[in-house]
């Protein structure tokens, strides 16, 4: 079929398998250009491995350190009539490239919040990966979670706490600056958001892996977070999602105390703002990203997901000098350090106040934001012929759960 982008709100409803594959190949090339190191992770489990930071970290571990990787995700394959999700094509492209490079790659498609998934992962670690993993990456961003004990569905919300929040935002369909009003979360919504996006599931994973004795000595685990800046704090860090991320921090401290007994440790890694399917859904964030990208590009500080993942593994968790990573007062690895530089944020605040419909494309990197967003789904690549016939049914070595 011939596939062109179709967008609805902050979602692109079509995906391009060839474009997605090329996106993955581009990230692999970026990691390979930094050279392969041997003093790093050997056997890696990535929970949430099909897009964004999870995919980038899987690429960095495999192609930057030669690691065996097991990836868990929840994606839809394409059919004769309909393309699959971008994550399906990303995972397929990773698997193909890893196997071509002689690397061990295993993938499981299913609900990462379920006990069945944990059992399957443990079974594969024992039967195929030598019985242990030494790095567990937790990178789930989900709007809902089915509680493994009760089967109840909890949903996360992107809402402030206490009072409604009014902010500048972009209507990405009309390319217009709008005033977005977001009503505050209820107590139940806050609790449910913590249940979905907090540290509970990460801890269940580490508990299960510990009890099954599949964590190697010196195992590290990392979960991803975002703090952002004053511009986004009301909706994010000071909102329902911020409560979930605070729960993630508390979980990290508990897990770290336990893993230190094995000579390992746990950290939350705070990452920079990037264009992902998750960030596109957060009011005010696309406009802020369009501004901060312009500022960081002008200062030579810009990074995408793969550059962040490479820096996380090479300069934080697995430093060449063998020293422990620098952490903040909450024991977090900060990879938003360049974004939060005073000079960067001061410029962002000035532009935030000045931006209008008339100067949106001049003052910000909004044109590239739109391009980067469509690129997530395999579009806007100069090396892909989008009028060519393409097969949406892509198969690969994946266990369906």
Curated annotation (Swiss-Prot):
The keyword Transit peptide does not apply. The active site is at 236 (proton donor). Keywords: Fatty acid biosynthesis, Fatty acid metabolism, Lipid biosynthesis, Lipid metabolism, NAD, Oxidoreductase. Substrate binds at residue 226. GO terms for molecular function: enoyl-[acyl-carrier-protein] reductase (NADH) activity; NAD binding; trans-2-enoyl-CoA reductase (NADH) activity. It is an enzyme of class 1 (oxidoreductase). NAD(+) binds at residues 48-53, 74-75, 111-112, 140-141, 245, 274-276. Pfam families: Eno-Rase_FAD_bd (PF07055), Eno-Rase_NADH_b (PF12242), Enoyl_reductase (PF12241). It comes from the Bacteria. Its EC number is 1.3.1.9. The record marks 75 as: Plays an important role in discriminating NADH against NADPH. One of its GO terms (biological process) is fatty acid biosynthetic process. The keyword Oxidoreductase applies. It catalyses: a 2,3-saturated acyl-[ACP] + NAD(+) = a (2E)-enoyl-[ACP] + NADH + H(+). Belongs to the TER reductase family. Monomer. This is Enoyl-[acyl-carrier-protein] reductase [NADH]. It comes from Xylella fastidiosa (strain 9a5c).
